[in-house]
Amino acid sequence: MLSKIFTVAVLSAVSAAHAQTAPSSPLSFRTVKLEAKSCHGKDQENKPICHESTVTYPITGNRHLDNWVRKQFHGTLPTQRSVQAKLNRNGIVKYTNQENPQDMRKGEPPCRLQFADEWSLGGYTPNYAVFRHDTWEFACGPRGNGNTELFVLKRGAAHPQPVKLGNILLPNQKAKLANLLKADYVKYLIEIARDGKQEASEQETLETLEYVNGRFGNGFQITNNWRFDKNGLTFEYNIGELGTYAEGGPELTIPVKDLQGII
């Protein structure tokens, strides 16, 4: 999880490359949550078959940042009415309502759909704010489908735009960053394989590194989902983005001491 207020250590590292005056007033973590439900028929136990949708958005109290959030909804913030109307019009909902009676006649349980479109303020420093966008859809398969996006915005700008990782990296440092992330990913895979029971042997470490190199070669995939963290820079990967579903979606953190000369 993001720290509410990121530490000065990382901020100073970034500010060395981007020394600008920015507001330091606190931001609000208030979040508006809108929920909708659409019911159609009943199941074998005479319980309503309902589909649900959740939409959230933050109100930071900063006009420019809140305007940026509004733009993510095409200029108009959602309302209870609009969320309900969108769920009612959803083509997947209509199709599922048609299929459920047939499935129940076969003795199968009905499908109850779930949707989520959630924006939130993840954290901030005096110079930057990090927004999080989580989407989720469960359509009655073996598992749901989720996705996370992170957006780092420069505070103080009238029309803020997401800061790209390349904007804070020093020249020719991408490969070094990739190697640091790869090393942390190897540690992550070893930890989940051993479930923290004991230290990995040198042989296990070499085998895991060989497995990762077989997938990525000499490089490594650097995600656009990065954020400032109290310990350094953290890169969040979606489930399955680097490997199998079972390997999960790791959060790889490069500590401040290793960022020297990179940002």
Cite the ranges covered by each PLM segment.
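Hydrophobic h-region of N-terminal signal peptides that target proteins for export
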Residues: V10-A19
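Compositionally biased intrinsically disordered regions enriched in Thr/Gly
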Residues: Q20-I263
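Sec-dependent signal peptide recognition
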Residues: M1-V8
